[in-house]
């Protein structure tokens, strides 16, 4: 708790009298005793808070729920109690039952195929359905307040859809019009519109702001839903104080700390508990929990459900939970139960009567099978077992089960109960009035009565402002890095135009520096898109919870960002303004800042609006690229208004930067006279009107140029437009604000995704075409008994190796010292044994597995880890299989391709490809994946579902045919009990075939636990509690615990839950009088373990083979690795048309837009300048290309470094080379397409083929440089934000110093070297010299310098001496007045001023090629130095002698 928060809390506590402590109050007293008053409950909160600050783990969840539920008078609670009645609930899904994988060819043919497809639909037979079909079919039931409903069913049966439907989360779903859902007399639509916060859905995915601590996250939730006008007329600050206390006790209840909510920085169980606590603090009357116990150990899951049970009884709330793995203890906590089978209801009623109902139907419950598993097994034809003699009497299909249910007495009783309930609580206004009264008591004073939110809009905005400020304050590194980047860019721009002279020599430089200042400040706002997309899911969730409206978060973001933007703008303005020597007048300086700030705010809001209306960040970035080009071209600087093509000239009127730039330029030049430094003619005798200044806006006979005349002649700007433009700019700002706020409320934040299987064209399995799906989920694997048949694997490698570890410790550096995660852990895994690794949450199970697999990249590992008594050799990693918790795969591959890739590169070279692929087919059959082996993996939420991904992860490791050991980290996490059982049986089969297996597991049932031979049990801190045999019915481990003082395990208890309980597991970490770590160290069992370890070392077996191929780090040579990896990468690109088409769309559009904007530039000086600026603008596509390439590289790098490199699948050189080379063909083709789209429109078709080909080569070079540069930058950096910042900064340097914006001769001496090292200098120089060499210049009327000759002389006579050395031409030598002089004769003179020469074109081509080669070498070198060498050194030094 922050100091200011603590002071506030103490001051509030001092106002209250001291009450007797109620910390000893029992749960029974709370449930059945006299009700507590508010003062007593406040005392409980304070006691719980003090216990939390003292580090006490004992915060009773029952006490906590009593206080949070009863912090008001009973009438308020009675009014908030809601029941749920659903009748004839039928829900259909949107979308296709399965999809066909798109490729580049199919995407290109789509415009032709779509009309044909529509025509066939019109004239052909109408399809039976347009979506994946009916998910839920006629469900009926009622859940009363105070009850818990357990939702059971196999994945794909409709459990998630059922929960979503109850809570009104209907994105992607259609509810049948005959369906009825009511909440104690309140209709469904009314409940969703007016009382949405009382009905919430806790989804399995967790989304939180990464820059908030857990405490801040929960405090926001508590404040958003804390009642603000309770009985007793308590003040608003006391309500806020209560919200703070509730959030603090939530931290203690769910064992959460002050760490950030970012998922990567926290364990899975911690993130899940954070979401659970947030949902509890929503104070909803009805909550649906979708597999929310995933990732929690058994004891913690039970504690969580018990807390919900207490909350339901005390507050009258009701909860529906879908649980895939429910222990008997957890099962007995529920009141009601619904069982779904293929979307049909086959039972609804009392939990106690569910098992007897199905037993009376004729089904047999196996011994030791928990009730939930038995009920779920009923819906699986391959698992359920009929009683003897009932084989032909029991129902078989879901239709038969539904018919049996509807004809049963239990269903008739349910119908009677529902009819009685509807008569008692009809759909009338009375219940709505009662609920309105309760809501008004809880709402703030100024909240709209019909609003589902408790806070008024101003209070929501204030709350969001506090949170936005917390996020900003917690992101100090981000703020500092962005400020440093802004300072550096400003310093570069300011020093590039350092001390611009107050003469005509600085006129062009002033325009350039103002253009760059406006453009860079405005385009930094592009990052707003990333910010908005990162918080979109969070804002959508909290709007569904009725915390705050989406537009209030948008307003808060704008308000909190304003001082940051003001600071950045002011900082940038001060640096650029004074370094460049712009107008030194206070009024003009502040006008400059005003327009800069307004332009930045306008562009930021424009990009936020763009992010709101798009569905993916790729779409937003593509459209943003279009906006950037339009903004840059049509400001009036690169293309003056009088040269704008009529078909695009209108763009400037809708371009906010056009108005800002005109005003800033006019502000700088208005009312100023710039002394001329170059005259025409430059003769010693000049008098009258016989000379003029050689700059736009000059007047014959005047020795200065008026600033107003200059901007009028150069840009067609006027000072009269300054404040008109500001009004228009503010109008743009207001318009985008209103549009942005409105769209955040109107448009949903996300498009629902469905786990629909994706197949390559022609590969869809026929069995899947008529599947009954939930959100596109396909029939589950492992559902037939044949999948459990004993496997026959003649090709399985013979296992003879033993992995042992002794005294393993692991320390990591933390602030202020080191933290020990593993402490003196010993054990072994022998061939043919299945070992379980268990422990409380955070005990170090995954850490130990990573240490044993030699996958740790930080910290110090000590102790012995040996294979057959020897140090592991270089082949150790590839000989082990490691199934991680994260299912990481290449999303475009099919299952069969992924398995073949693993087999081809990880099985020994001595095994032929045919044998490897044959083995893959055996793995597919063993895992029961035949029906979807050709399915594309896809991304999470779109493609394989959770179970299929887990099976694939196991299959990938099994396909490698590991010769040593298989590690499985939480292989059953997120799976239903049937799938978990099947996977454990599969591990058992592997062990029976001689394969040593080590697996972590956190929620095993008693039957599942018996599959393991040995157990390694860890306590908090990575300390050993037990290592040894499990025994029949776990008697060996139970006897050990009981003889050391644990209570006796009951005959129906789950041994896994029992063990967690007796050592102090669960959310509260219940204290135990027994020091189990000390007991183990002094036990005879530990002595036996150490003796066995000594024997394994003293009598090593299986000496290391001499064959060097068997000891090599990789199974296959580099050439074979390169072949398979390159083939996969090429396939990936071909199967991602959205990536390739976005790349080509950006390039072709950019080329066409620039081409038509600079259409057929004439031979005037302005025309040649337009040609150069067209190259400058074409370079802006560089940033878009780089930002497309880098995320793709990072995703592939993550897969390689997290899974494929530790497994020694292939070498790092193969990885980096393939990543570089796979881009080059597409970049080459993109360069050709871009050249064709802009070359002829800008340069015409009258140039020689040699010049056309050379410009084509330069264009292709540019795109090759862009891809290799992106990989050079991102190869070593840790994340996309840093990579994008570095790439943008480097590109900006190259762009600024390429000679277009500032000629080399005008650069400050310090920056001259940058012109020479900028790759774009050679690109621009090569193309412009090739395109413009030898072209004559014909000045336009605006560019001609007009003056009168002395009386009695013609223009030719007057300028005869001057023309001998001048570069220009005289148009009318015989005229005696108005001499017309063009300052330049040929384009080469124009280019020479920028140090560009025709003779250097091939040199430029060669130098630019060298930069491409440098990028490739640099990417390889940096990746090795930063990502490979430290990893290799860590692996070499990870093992230390004991």
UniProtKB/Swiss-Prot annotation:
Main localisation: membrane
Location relative to the cell: Membrane
Binding site for ATP: 839-846
SUPFAM superfamilies, per the entry: P-loop containing nucleoside triphosphate hydrolases (SSF52540)
Gene Ontology MF, one: ATP hydrolysis activity
Region (Disordered): 1-24, 768-797
Pfam families: ABC2_membrane, ABC2_membrane_7, ABC_tran, PDR_CDR
Domain ABC transporter: 120-367, 803-1045
Transmembrane feature ranges: 476-496, 513-533, 558-578, 587-607, 620-640, 727-747, 1139-1159, 1171-1191, 1212-1232, 1254-1274, 1280-1300, 1405-1425
Disulfide bonds listed in the record: none
Record keyword Transport present: yes
One Gene Ontology term, aspect cellular component: membrane
Alphabetical keyword list: ATP-binding, Membrane, Nucleotide-binding, Repeat, Transmembrane, Transmembrane helix, Transport
Membrane topology, from the record: Multi-pass membrane protein
Similarity annotation: Belongs to the ABC transporter superfamily. ABCG family. PDR (TC 3.A.1.205) subfamily.
Keyword Transmembrane found: yes
Name listed for the protein in its UniProt record: ABC-type transporter adrC
InterPro entries for this protein: AAA+_ATPase, ABC2_TM, ABC_transporter-like_ATP-bd, ABCG_dom, ABCG_PDR_2, P-loop_NTPase, PDR_CDR_ABC
Function noted in UniProt: ABC-type transporter; part of the gene cluster that mediates the biosynthesis of the meroterpenoid compound andrastin A, a promising antitumoral compound. Is required for the production of andrastin A but does not have a significant role in its secretion.
Superkingdom of this protein's organism: Eukaryota
